[in-house]
């Protein structure tokens, strides 16, 4: 069988394209060398946030992220959950306080697009009622809403929905070579990493959704994907420290999140250029990076110095290349690269850049390009309206609590 499209990479972008393409009637093969969402997707801060910090230098990314985060919430209510945040304000910085409130006022319209509440300004007493451990020099706080997500299930359910629409899934299968007819890419050769079997799959279009590995995959065809990979680490604590997140400030001014997530708390992230092997980035977490994050937490909550980290982990962002820009200020915009026009290699597309909150839009745009390259007429995407598996009919938890002797909130947590 010759597939319409073979996709290399089962992170959220690859799985999203597989779902969109399959739902628009294309035959799809999806390859992932590990398990769904095992790379950059799984190493994220696990929020479909609106890109608040990008508002300073990349307003279009904030807009599209906020709009598509609302769609992700709509199609995956069982995977997403509200995280109310506090942004501590410190003594001696009155102008900074006013600037931050003006900044959140500008962000409010984007927050509302994804279902968040308007920000509020709290006194020190009000802030300490919510988080009693705040440092003595905290004179107040600002509030805002973001949304957490189970990233591994999000990637897996996109792949599952693609399969229900007819896609073939190949987890734990590494693409080791591209197949050619002349200069045209015509498929992939893959190796099953569980049993060692090597097999070939032909396709009319091959999509490189390899994330930070995209440059290496494109190089198999003599093509080029220019990225500026960024390393980000997180520290996880073994308990849920509170029900509110905190927006922290690193010693270099970088925004850092302390995020309650299930029974754990996540602290992150850093942002540094990285040109090593993305598969080994977990082995390159340094004591200085961990200390940097812990110091940011201790600035807001002195007791954080006594918290016991459970683990530290890292990932690599596949950010688009920019020269002369600090890693923290790199754009999170995305591009679909057509290597026929860029490198004279027909049959190969690459996905570059992007962020978790706008994966669905990225997949829609990529599928539009695939349809055009295949000579098919345009077909509308339904991925922003069709619920992911398991989200079709959320139960009435209040009514269910009358039958099961548990609080509605507990039942909702079990359902999620």
Describe these PLM feature segments.
Residues 208-222:
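Flavin (primarily FAD) binding-site architecture
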Residues 3, 196-205:
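Core beta-strand elements of the Rossmann-like FAD/NAD(P) dinucleotide-binding domain
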Residues 45-130:
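Dinucleotide-binding Rossmann-like beta1-alpha1 core, especially the glycine-rich loop
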Residues 171-186:
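A conserved short coil-to-beta-strand element within the FAD-binding core of flavoproteins
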Residues 8, 201-211:
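Short hydrophobic core segments
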Residues 226-233, 240-241, 247-266, 273-416:
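C-terminal catalytic lobe of FAD-dependent flavoproteins
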Residues 22-42:
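Glycine-rich FAD pyrophosphate-binding loop
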């Amino acid at each position: 069988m010759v597939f319409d499209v073979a996709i290399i990479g089962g992170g959220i972008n690859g799985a999203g394209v597989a779902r969109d393409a399959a739902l628009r009637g294309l035959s799809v093969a999806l390859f992932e060398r590990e398990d769904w969402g095992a790379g950059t997707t799984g190493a994220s801060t696990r929020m479909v946030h609106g890109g608040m910090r990008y508002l300073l230098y990349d307003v279009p990314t904030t807009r599209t992220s906020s709009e598509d985060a609302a769609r992700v919430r709509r199609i995956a209510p069982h995977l997403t959950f509200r995280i109310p945040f506090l942004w501590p304000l410190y003594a001696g910085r009155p102008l900074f306080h006013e600037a931050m409130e003006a900044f959140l006022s500008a962000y409010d319209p984007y927050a509302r697009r994804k279902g968040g509440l308007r920000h509020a300004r709290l006194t020190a007493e009000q802030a300490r009622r919510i988080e009693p451990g705040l440092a003595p020099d905290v004179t107040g706080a600002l509030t805002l809403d973001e949304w957490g997500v189970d990233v591994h299930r999000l990637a897996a359910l996109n792949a599952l929905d693609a399969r229900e629409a007819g896609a073939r899934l190949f987890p734990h299968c590494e693409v080791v070579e591209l197949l050619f007819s002349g200069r045209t890419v015509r498929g992939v050769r893959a190796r099953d990493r569980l049993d060692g079997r090597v097999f070939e799959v032909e396709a009319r279009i091959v999509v490189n959704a390899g994330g930070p590995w995209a440059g290496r995959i494109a190089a198999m065809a003599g093509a080029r994907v220019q990225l500026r990979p960024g390393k980000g680490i997180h520290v996880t604590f073994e308990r849920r420290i509170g029900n509110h997140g905190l927006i922290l400030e690193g010693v270099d001014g970088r925004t850092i999140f302390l995020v309650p997530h299930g029974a754990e708390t996540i602290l992150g992230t850093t942002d540094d250029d990285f040109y090593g092997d993305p598969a080994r980035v977990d082995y390159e977490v340094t004591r200085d990076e961990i200390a940097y994050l812990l110091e940011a937490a201790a600035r807001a909550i002195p007791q954080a110095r006594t918290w016991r980290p459970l683990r530290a982990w890292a990932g690599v962002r596949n950010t688009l290349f920019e020269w002369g820009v600090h890693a923290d200020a790199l754009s999170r915009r995305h591009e679909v690269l057509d290597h026929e026009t860029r490198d004279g290699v027909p049959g190969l597309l690459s996905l570059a850049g992007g962020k978790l909150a706008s994966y669905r839009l990225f997949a829609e745009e990529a599928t539009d390009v695939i349809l055009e390259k295949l000579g098919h007429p345009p077909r509308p995407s339904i991925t922003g309206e069709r619920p992911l598996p398991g989200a079709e009919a959320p139960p009435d938890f209040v009514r269910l609590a009358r039958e099961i002797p548990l609080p509605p909130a507990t039942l909702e947590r079990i359902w999620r």
